[in-house]
Amino acid sequence: MYARVTTFPGLAPERIKATLEEFTEHHLPRLEQAPGYRGVWVGVDYPGGRAIAVTYWETNDALHASDALANEMRAAAVTKAGVDRNRPPITDRYEMVLEKHSAAV
C-alpha cells in the first residue's frame, strides 16, 4: 500500500469546516472512483489552523496516476480554506510498511 500525505499549515480556522464540507460533497466521490484508491484520513487542528490529509493507494502506479486529481483537490482546498500563501501545503509520498490496530475491547 502507498500513501500521499499532505499537510496544510496556515489555514484560516473559521474556513476549515466549510472546506471539509466541500471536500466531502464534491471531491471525495471522485476520489473514491479513482483506480487503486483505498481510503482517506483527514485530521484537523482547528485552533492552530492546520490539517493533514492522507490518501491510501493499492499500488505506487495508482498513487502516481492520481496526481492530477490530487493537485486539483489541493488547489480547491487552498482557495476555499484561505491558505496563507507564505505557508503552502506540503505533499509527500510513502510506501506503507506496517499497519497495526489495537484489539477490540
Residue map of PLM features:
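Short S/T/G/P-rich N-terminal loop/turn motif that feeds into the first structured element of a domain
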Residues: 1-52, 58-72, 79-105
